């Protein structure tokens, strides 16, 4: 969804996660969101995107939340607004609630907000991140927990901290553990048991994939490597069995079987290259069980 630097696109593309192949046209966002529009999340019926930046309009940041039904292709619709305009936003969801965290404009935020995905409206305060890590991290969810992985800290640069929340309970995030490396803009996802972070940069692009067991606090472990061209700020999508990642500034899509450690396998091609910062969501991710 969206993406692209310096020329933002409003294009939305889709895949069927269990069927390797090239992406297809879905529709358009209401605005062409730029490179930092990587807040994507979903329920079983709707996909969402929130915030972002449109570089063609003098680095304009947005607070808009948009949605569309997964069952039919078409353009996204207005859902509501975040409390502030910002980009580099993180997000996670279970079947009922979507949480949007962090971002910057131009200074970083540590705020977290939420929406009830079945009811249009503006985001409401959820709590604060326990650390100043607040931008461009990876997003993972189970039906119970949401994880924010790595990202950027204004004092320390790229970081490896993983923090978590209980999605159904308002409050501040807590420390979960650490990723195997410091990185920003990873592609992230998983199922209800295991969360995966792949790619990203620090400062050059990395091909490392690591994973956590979402129910157990602790550090990430090695999963494998990105076999083809690794990218940064690429979108991702998950089913209960498969995690698909997109290159970011390239045209490749690769996947892994979530419960089987190993290197990525070719999935298909991105027909309409969207560039870095494209958001991703699915109706089969870990937050849905």
Describe the role of every protein-language-model region.
Residues 1-289:
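Polar, enzyme-active/binding microenvironments
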